[in-house]
């Protein structure tokens, strides 16, 4: 969980980019992943 916490802190810098990527991934996978 420590690694995830550190990763989240890093992703927070690219929150907007992550949201776009996650939205694209969700659409690509057909919303299979949350």
From Swiss-Prot:
Compartment(s) of residence: Secreted
Keyword GTP-binding tagged: no
Main location per the UniProt record: secreted
Extent of the signal sequence: none
GO cellular component annotations of the record: extracellular region
Domain of life (superkingdom): Eukaryota
Expression (tissue specificity): Expressed by the venom gland.
Disulfide bond positions: none
Keyword list, A-Z: Neurotoxin, Secreted, Toxin
Annotated GO MF terms: toxin activity
Keyword presence, Isomerase: no
UniProt similarity note: Belongs to the scolopendra toxin 3 family.
The protein, known as: Scolopendra 5848.48 Da toxin
